[in-house]
Amino acid sequence: MTTTSAFMLNVRLDNVAVVAIDVPGEKVNTLKAEFAAQVRAILKQIRENKALQGVVFISAKADNFIAGADINMIGHCQNAQEAETLARQGQQLMAEIQALPVPVIAAIHGACLGGGLEMALACHRRICTDDVKTVLGLPEVQLGLLPGSGGTQRLPRLVGVSTALDMILTGKQLRARQALKAGLVDDVVPQTILLEAAVELAKKERLAQRTLPVRERILAGPLGRALLFRLVRKKTAQKTQGNYPATERIIDVIETGLAQGSSSGYDAEARAFGELAMTPQSQALRAIFFASTKVKKDPGSDAPPGPLNSVGILGGGLMGGGIAWVTACKGGLPVRIKDINTQGINHALKYSWDLLETKVRRRHIKASERDKQLALISGSTDYRGFSHRDLVIEAVFEDLPLKQQMVAEVEQNCAAHTIFASNTSSLPIGDIAANAARPEQVIGLHFFSPVEKMPLVEVIPHASTSAQTIATTVKLAKKQGKTPIVVSDKAGFYVNRILAPYINEAIRMLTEGERVEHIDAALVKFGFPVGPIQLLDEVGIDTGTKIIPVLEAAYGERFSAPANVVASILNDDRKGRKNGRGFYLYGEKGRKSKKQVDPAIYKLIGVQGQSRLSAQQVAERCVMLMLNEAARCFDEKVIRSARDGDIGAVFGIGFPPFLGGPFRYMDALGPGEMVATLQRLAALYGPRYAPCEQLVRMAERREHFWTNGETDQGN
């Protein structure tokens, strides 16, 4: 084979063929259509070599097997027929691998996802390493697709239909031990012996057939299968609200294969893949994927980042504890926490311990790895251990004088190059830096709660922040596993600014008599993970409403909330889930009961709670205000691009991913339709709905936020 081949064949002296996978010039292996000829040439050599005892597919990359198929291939398809052909070509190649006359083993280390797992499924057996980097899954549903190279047919027959449905419908990734338990792999070994273990398995003349567990065998029968698919359809419809067509097609295709045989299943899989590839939902989800990939590669500024070897954190509360965990346990950086008392430090340490112990309990990591990661975190009630910190993150109360004091103390106790990053959600960074000796090293770094789960951070430079400070802070965010967007130092920044009118309108409709559950259900139906009122309960009613006066002072009446209602709720000691008193009823330890609204809430705000608006009207009122504010942020350059605005909304507040983000959604509606809708709502509900100048200009010029030169492709 030539040196540019992604697949290279080597026949060992013991007559086992080793096919090494190494896509030239790429950090990860992905499958491309042009590789098919290379693979077929190798398969031909294998078939012709009658002395071969077996075949092993293994990656030559350091930490991944195959991360999936190259998604750009789908974007190049002009219609469903072309996408279907792409799937059929993949199916045929996998069938040729499966048809080899000798044992074929996939030796897996690192990510084995999508088309990579479909290739592994076409092999006769699979062995993987016990490394934390090794994960196996079929995440195509997250792109609005289904596995198109045989995955919907081979996986159910290997691991059972219920396990396969769960994996394919959710896109969940299994770690090595989970994959072994599920029957997805046949053995788990240390990386050092992966190849030899695979070779030994390949030499076996007969490979024992795995027997499915009794439960899976029952579910594979006609009666069990009918019951299972009926339940899965019901649960999936409740979860997706009909917004994700891929899930229904996945269920149909798997059921077809089990009921009518593999041939019909493969045919249904290819057709469904082609049709789904052309849906607006898949196009939007792929656009989000490419946008997030580009954001993760964006350095934030043109300057090189400064040193980043250790981090300090001020405050050991909920946010400080979460920031310490992502910095040490995801970023691998030593962390020193300062709190005014040892309780705060202990809280932060316990925060990380609990998260790590859960990983140990689930066998994601070993106890030794837990101890190693926890050892990166230390604490003190003074500034001992801070002198060499490259960046210090402040996570104290939202009090401007206190934060300014923190700046002064860090400048006094840390190195001259130390960056001060504030986790404020509402205070201007320029005000925090007002008295700084080195204002160019002060920046905002806004995390979202819970820190360990929320993928977004906002990086907020003020007018004097240096380019190097921006680059260093963005670098830290990436090390923490976050997706950073750089936003301007204006009140509310970006995410909270577009979220506030959305929540305000929900509260306003509540005061008009709409029921809590009706408002929340309408927005969940629209595509949000939770409704606005439940969201307020989750983040804390006090926390979620404290920014409203800041925004109202900065931008005027359009940000005003029904103040008497908010005050009444807070005065009744209702903070949401955290104190077990909110809009919803809570059981023990603040657990929310199953969608039960506290009926006392209506009496508290003086309404009876009788819904009059349709779900579509409720969603329209909330969402249009969010979109209008997002357009203002674009106009005022609060965000650098529509791309950043879409990523910020999807990753920061759960804007429906299948719509692609607020800017792709506005482009889909069209600026003219946006303006007309806002004008209609303004006539009904008041000037807060008046379309912003940006949208009016775009409607006049027939412009879009995403230009023709910007595509959903990854290159």
Curated annotation (Swiss-Prot):
Pfam families: 3HCDH (PF00725), 3HCDH_N (PF02737), ECH_1 (PF00378). It is found in: Cytoplasm. Its main location: cytoplasm. The record marks E118, E140 as: Important for catalytic activity. GO terms for cellular component: cytoplasm. Residues 1-190 are annotated as: Enoyl-CoA hydratase. One of its GO terms (biological process) is fatty acid beta-oxidation. Residues 306-714 are annotated as: 3-hydroxyacyl-CoA dehydrogenase. CDD domains: crotonase-like. Signal peptide: none annotated. GO terms for molecular function: 3-hydroxybutyryl-CoA epimerase activity; enoyl-CoA hydratase activity; long-chain-3-hydroxyacyl-CoA dehydrogenase activity; NAD+ binding. Pathway: Lipid metabolism; fatty acid beta-oxidation. Keywords: Cytoplasm, Fatty acid metabolism, Isomerase, Lipid degradation, Lipid metabolism, Lyase, Multifunctional enzyme, NAD, Oxidoreductase. Its EC number is 4.2.1.17, 5.1.2.3, 1.1.1.35. It catalyses: a (3S)-3-hydroxyacyl-CoA = a (2E)-enoyl-CoA + H2O; a 4-saturated-(3S)-3-hydroxyacyl-CoA = a (3E)-enoyl-CoA + H2O; a (3S)-3-hydroxyacyl-CoA + NAD(+) = a 3-oxoacyl-CoA + NADH + H(+); (3S)-3-hydroxybutanoyl-CoA = (3R)-3-hydroxybutanoyl-CoA. In the N-terminal section; belongs to the enoyl-CoA hydratase/isomerase family. HAMAP family: FadJ. Heterotetramer of two alpha chains (FadJ) and two beta chains (FadI). Catalyzes the formation of a hydroxyacyl-CoA by addition of water on enoyl-CoA. Also exhibits 3-hydroxyacyl-CoA epimerase and 3-hydroxyacyl-CoA dehydrogenase activities. This is Fatty acid oxidation complex subunit alpha. The lineage of its organism: Bacteria, Pseudomonadati, Pseudomonadota, Gammaproteobacteria, Enterobacterales.
